Amino acid sequence: VEGYTIEECDKPDGVGTTITLKLKDDTDDEKYSTYLDQYQIQSLVKKYSDYIRFPIRMEVEHTHYNEEGKEPEVHKAIETLNSMTPIWKKNKSELKDEDYNNFYMEKFGDYEPPVAHIHSKNEGVATYDALLYIPARAPFDYYSKDYEKGLQLYSSGVMIMEKCADLLPDWFSFVKGVVDSEDLSLNISRELLQQDRQLKIIAKNLEKSIKNELAKLLKNDREKYEKFYSVFCLLYTSDAA
């Protein structure tokens, strides 16, 4: 290879890679400068990269209000923005029902704990972690045409799709949850994802897990099962019709 030179690096840290991003100027249609806003950055990291294994740190400003009439004080500190360790990567022995319920209510914006959860880890032809929930109540738009089924799909802790409909059959469209697989590419398109063999295997396994969980509820906890059925029975009666 011709046309290159090697020289001493004056980087103070000495190691690692620095990536500098430059934003385009704002236009009438696009306000790129919003991506420099502290809360916007925090929100994007929380949504897409909350569960990657490495810390994402940023200098964060906090405003402290003192006595009335005095100027507020602004303090800056380097903070880690992401959680790093997702609940579905933890061992079941480390977790209580309260942990599962709190995650569900925070993640999916529900004020009521789910009827049941399914925490599974699969290795082999398709390697993945899954945490599924059977809600105690239907979303307000569940029986409307606007409702979109799907599970949150992650690749090594990075969310690649917020609602992957191909992971759930229509008769289990009420199930909420996350699936995380290292076998899926981060930049896979929606079209290729629909044809992905790994995804089809995962979907088949999840359907079986949901069936088994509902059968277990029916046998061991009739009260919970009847609560579930009273909410979602219209789905099955309409399908039968």
Predicted segments — roles?
Residues V1-K70, A77-T80, S155:
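GHKL-type ATPase core
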Residues L167-F174, S181, K208, N212, ...:
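Charged, alpha-helical coiled-coil and linker scaffolds that mediate dimerization/oligomerization
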Residues L186-N220:
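Extended, well-ordered alpha-helical scaffold/bundle regions in very large, multi-domain proteins
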